[in-house]
């Protein structure tokens, strides 16, 4: 199935010059959303995953159905101040400054094999920060899966040591 047919390109959003990849038009078609999810599930089965981790918010949209299909848990990575219990955190750079990602301190057990999911790989900053959180808790990043990769931003270069699946490349 050509998943790109179901992604809407929105010009000049959220700012001029950006060609935003809107996945809601993929997700609102059950058979297409299921197909994309199933592709990630098949990839993950080979990795013997214990837990799926995804950064907010679209990492949840991808990761939760994958975790459900695999019969494993899902641990959210959120911006600072959004998780109610004790967390660990990591600062990471954005094109316009810095932000902080957090995960519950007890979300991952040492040695657990983790699949990280997100909708889009751009510069790699968010996933690089997510990897740091997983590894700080003793998790093993067994794989990383994205719906979309923006190849021209070279985000994959930051992730050389990891196995990556992308379903669509632009």
Curated annotation (Swiss-Prot):
Family: Belongs to the purine/pyrimidine phosphoribosyltransferase family.
Pfam families assigned to the protein according to its UniProt record, in alphabetical order: Pribosyltran (PF00156)
Coiled coil: none
Principal location listed in the UniProt entry: cytoplasm
Origin: domain of life: Bacteria
Name listed for the protein in its UniProt record: Adenine phosphoribosyltransferase
Gene: apt
GO MF annotation terms: adenine binding; adenine phosphoribosyltransferase activity; AMP binding
Keywords: Cytoplasm, Glycosyltransferase, Purine salvage, Transferase
GO CC term, one of those recorded: cytoplasm
EC number: 2.4.2.7
Record text on subunit structure and interactions: Homodimer.
Role description: Catalyzes a salvage reaction resulting in the formation of AMP, that is energically less costly than de novo synthesis.
BP GO terms, sorted: adenine salvage; AMP salvage; purine ribonucleoside salvage
Subcellular location: Cytoplasm
């Amino acid at each position: 199935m050509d998943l790109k047919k179901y992604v809407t390109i929105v010009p000049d959003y959220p700012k001029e010059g950006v060609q935003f990849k809107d996945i809601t038009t993929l997700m609102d078609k059950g058979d297409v959303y299921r197909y994309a999810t199933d592709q990630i599930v098949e990839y993950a089965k080979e990795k013997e995953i214990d837990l799926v981790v995804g950064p907010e918010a679209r990492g949840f949209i991808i990761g939760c159905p994958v975790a459900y299909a695999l019969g494993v848990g899902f641990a959210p990575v959120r911006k600072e101040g959004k998780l109610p219990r004790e967390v660990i955190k990591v600062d990471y750079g954005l094109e316009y400054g810095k932000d902080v990602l957090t995960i519950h301190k007890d979300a991952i057990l040492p040695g657990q094999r983790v699949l990280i999911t997100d909708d889009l790989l751009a510069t790699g900053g968010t996933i690089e920060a997510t990897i740091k959180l997983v590894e700080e808790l003793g998790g093993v990043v067994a794989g990383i899966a994205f719906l979309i990769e923006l190849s021209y931003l070279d985000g994959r270069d930051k992730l050389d040591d990891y196995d990556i699946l992308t379903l669509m490349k632009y």
